[in-house]
Amino acid sequence: MEDIIIFRNLGPQVNGFALITGYQLHNWYESRKFCGKCGHPLVPDARERMMYCPHCKNTEYPKISPAVIVGVRNGNRLLMSKYAGGTARRYALIAGFAEIGESLEETVKREVMEEVGLKVKNIEYYKSQPWSLSSSLLMGFYCDLEGSDQIVLEEDELSEAQWFEREEIPYDDYDVSLTREMMIRFKKGLA
């Protein structure tokens, strides 16, 4: 997995995304040799990106997990964090996966509360980005702080979180992520 991460910064951007998407699809096809329902061999469908079981008629589609990226605003400040695990050491925004039975807006509120102990309001959808590195569909949201700005860090998930003034927001010039785009938009006063 670590080797494939180099493709996220490959230029032009479309090449990196194509390679990562191909990697995701390759891994999915390799892991879908047999039906999860009856155990018989699966065959690729001729028209759709799916695997089909001729024996029990079961169909299997690639897994895509919905996840949110959250830009929490507090006036001219943006909440930024660093993950506790993994290899990424750059600043990011609050993020997390949607749970079963949960709307994306509920996911935004839950993730912010879980990771930094803050309440938010005025949740606004920005845009989405496929993220094949984690088989996710990332959906970006901006929202406003509601109440106290006192951060209560969830140390199992984050190593740090802090408020940055608009002009102080750090970002990686070579990153092609939705997170980076949202940070730059806020820095430029567009969000």
Range-by-range predicted roles:
Residues 33, 50-93, 97-98, 119-120, ...:
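N-terminal strand-loop-strand
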Residues 92-127, 141, 145:
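The catalytic Nudix box helix
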Residues 1-32, 87-91, 155-191:
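Nudix hydrolase/Nudix homology domain
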Residues 44-49:
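Short linker/helix segments within small regulatory modules
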Residues 40-43, 61:
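Short functional micro-motifs and their immediate structural scaffolds
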Residues 129-152:
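Active-site-adjacent beta-strand/loop module that shapes the phosphate/pyrophosphate-binding cleft
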